[in-house]
Structures are given as C-alpha cells and as structure tokens.
C-alpha cells in the first residue's frame, strides 16, 4: 500500500496492489494521509521559516558574508543540516563545510533568484554525489527588494523519514512525497518501497497508461482518491 503526498499542494492518493479495497481500508488510508500531511506541512513550514529568518540575519551582516557563514556552521550542526550555503547571483557559493560549489543554472537556485522559497525534490549533491533535499530562499538587501543571492539549507534525503516511517497497516504501509509534476521529493525507506521510482506518473504508466493519465488529471485538478 502506498500513500502518496504532494508538496506544495499536499494531496494524497492510495495505491493498493492485490485485492480490491473496501470502504474501511479507504477510510483508514484517508485518515493516515490526513495525519501525515499535517505533520509534513508543520515540519515544512517550521523549517522554511527558520531558513528565511537566517536569510534576514545574513542580509543584516552582508558586508562580511564569510564570517556570517562561519557563524552558521554551529547552527547547521545543531539542526542536523548537511550544510548551509550562500550563493551569489553568478553561482559562486560559500558553504559552512568548505564544499566548493557553483550553483549557476540549478533549477532551484534560479527560482530563488526570482523570489521563490522552495523545497527541492531529491537531487544529487554536487559536492559528493549523495542524495539530498534543499530548502532555498532569496536573500534580500536589508533596505530594498534587491536580491543579493540565495541561501540554502542542505539536508540528507531522509529529512522527513521520521514522519514517513510512521507505521500503517501493521507496518506494510509506506509514504512518498511528490511534487505537482509527479517527481519524488522524499522517498520512502520502507523495505517494500519502490526505491527506484523517480516520477510516479512514469512509474504507473509502465503498468497502466490509463491509470497514470487519470491520476495526473485528478491531481492537477485538486482531486483525491485511490487506484488499484
């Protein structure tokens, strides 16, 4: 059984492989989905507010960005981050762990430069090749709307594992978080999970093209439901 949640629109779908689902199972899935989305939304909002607050602090000491990043090293460690990074508009990046990076051309970097605050899908870390999730937000000039660069908080890809690992259906249930394009944001670490799934639409399409199309249409229109 797979419960699939979407960020940012936080809709949920259920996929049962095998016997036909009765209403009790559907109701149980819906309740599990609602609880999970509340927990994920709470964590997401708390983390994003924290990153945006850091961006404000950085803007206030922007005349010494290197020293500001040094001060953030202990902050990153305290909150379980892999690193905190600040990127100038040209992509040149300062990091709390000394990683040498240039973020120019990165999708999330470019979105933040346009003023968006974003949680990335699961992506490959340019520093070491491991899977990560990244919160990014713009850093504004303290006295204007000028964007000075992008602040990023980098987490290992198990960022929501404690929430997604909550047991459902005697330990047989597991959860993914996907975005509005169907891309996996947070994968499940359950032993029965589909670890190789990158996009849920593409995955379902391999088995049932009509189901994949229906799923995509429902989610794009703000619907909810299940498929077998």
Model-found features: residue ranges?
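Extreme N-terminal signal-anchor transmembrane helix of membrane signaling/transducer proteins, especially
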Residues: 1-19, 23
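Charged, alpha-helical scaffolding/interaction elements associated with membrane systems
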Residues: 23, 114-115, 221
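Extracytoplasmic/periplasmic sensory segments of membrane signal-transduction proteins
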Residues: 27-36, 42-118, 167
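Solvent-exposed, extracytoplasmic
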Residues: 64-80, 150-196, 200-202
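Extracytoplasmic/periplasmic ligand-binding sensor regions of membrane-associated signaling proteins
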Residues: 78, 84, 89-167, 174, ...
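Allosteric regulatory "coupling" segments in signal-transduction proteins
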Residues: 95-105, 193-204
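Extracellular/periplasmic juxtamembrane segments that couple receptor/chemosensory ectodomains to their
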Residues: 181, 201-228
């Amino acid at each position: 059984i797979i419960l699939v949640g979407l960020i940012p629109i936080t809709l949920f779908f259920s996929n049962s492989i095998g016997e036909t689902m009765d209403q009790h199972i559907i109701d149980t899935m819906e309740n599990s989905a609602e609880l999970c989305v509340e927990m994920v939304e709470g964590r997401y909002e708390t983390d994003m507010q924290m990153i945006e607050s850091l961006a404000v602090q950085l803007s206030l000491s922007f005349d010494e960005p290197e020293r500001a990043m040094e001060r953030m090293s202990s902050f990153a460690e305290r909150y379980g981050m892999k690193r905190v990074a600040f990127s100038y508009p040209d992509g040149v990046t300062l990091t709390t762990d000394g990683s040498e990076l240039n973020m120019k051309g990165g999708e999330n970097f470019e979105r933040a430069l346009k003023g968006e605050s974003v949680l990335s899908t699961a992506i490959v870390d340019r520093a070491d090749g491991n899977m990560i999730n990244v919160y990014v937000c713009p850093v504004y000039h303290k006295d204007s709307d000028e964007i000075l660069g992008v602040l990023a908080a980098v987490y290992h890809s198990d960022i929501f594992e404690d929430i997604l690992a909550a047991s459902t259906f005697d330990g047989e249930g597991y959860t993914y978080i996907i975005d509005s394009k169907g891309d996996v944001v947070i994968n499940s670490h359950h032993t029965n999970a589909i670890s190789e799934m990158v996009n849920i639409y593409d995955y379902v399409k391999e088995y049932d093209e009509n189901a994949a199309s229906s799923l995509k249409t429902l989610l794009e229109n703000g619907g909810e439901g299940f498929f077998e």
